[in-house]
Amino acid sequence: CKSAILVVFGEMDWEKGWTQQFHYGAIRNNNSKMFKLLGPDTGFDSIGEFTTAKAMAKFLDRLNSNGKLTKTILYNLNPCANEVGNFQDGTVAGKIQFGSGWWFLDQKDGMEKQMNALSVLGLLSRFVGMLTDSRSFLSYPRHEYFRRTLCNLVGRDVENGEIPISEMERVNQMIEDISYYNAKNFFQF
């Protein structure tokens, strides 16, 4: 029943030209003593290990087979599930996105691992960048931290000769795109 509802929502997103986003991999409210004391969602969560790949692939395939697979961003919490690479069809650049590191992974190491995995299996240049937890005002500074981490990562690649220094104009444009324009264009704001 849950998957049928998700399919209907996915089709509705496709009809509206919207993007569907899935955050998965968390085990919530694990410390019962603190849960009783402070309530839900107060920082006592863990990275989970779930077998979501088959179910997610079937879900996306069903939408794709019906011609109604909308733009999709997948955010995983467990870094062992970083690699994603199905259902690109050329209609939208980066149609299926590997979302930015979040929760336990929205720190330097987690962000770098996510961007490196994306670079290996996709196009970093099409990445829509950092997300914001709009429920928390304090989450907004992570965009600045993300941009600095992105620039350091790409700068190291240039210093190591992995990106030719003669391509700096393209590199600069890629940084601007990841920091702003890709999201603007992807979400059609």
Short names for language-model regions:
Residues S134-R135, S139-H143:
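Catalytic grooves of carbohydrate-active enzymes
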Residues T91, L105, D109, F137:
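C-terminal catalytic subdomain
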Residues I96-D106, G129-L131, N160-N172:
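A generic structural motif
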Residues S46-F50, P141, R170:
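Alpha-helix capping and helix-loop boundary segments enriched in small/acidic/polar residues
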Residues L124-S125, R142-F189:
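Mid-to-C-terminal alpha-helical segments outside catalytic/metal-binding sites
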Residues G25-N29, L77-P79, G101-L105, R135:
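Active-site beta-loop-alpha junctions enriched in small/polar residues
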Residues H23, D133, A183:
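Divalent metal-coordination and catalytic microenvironments
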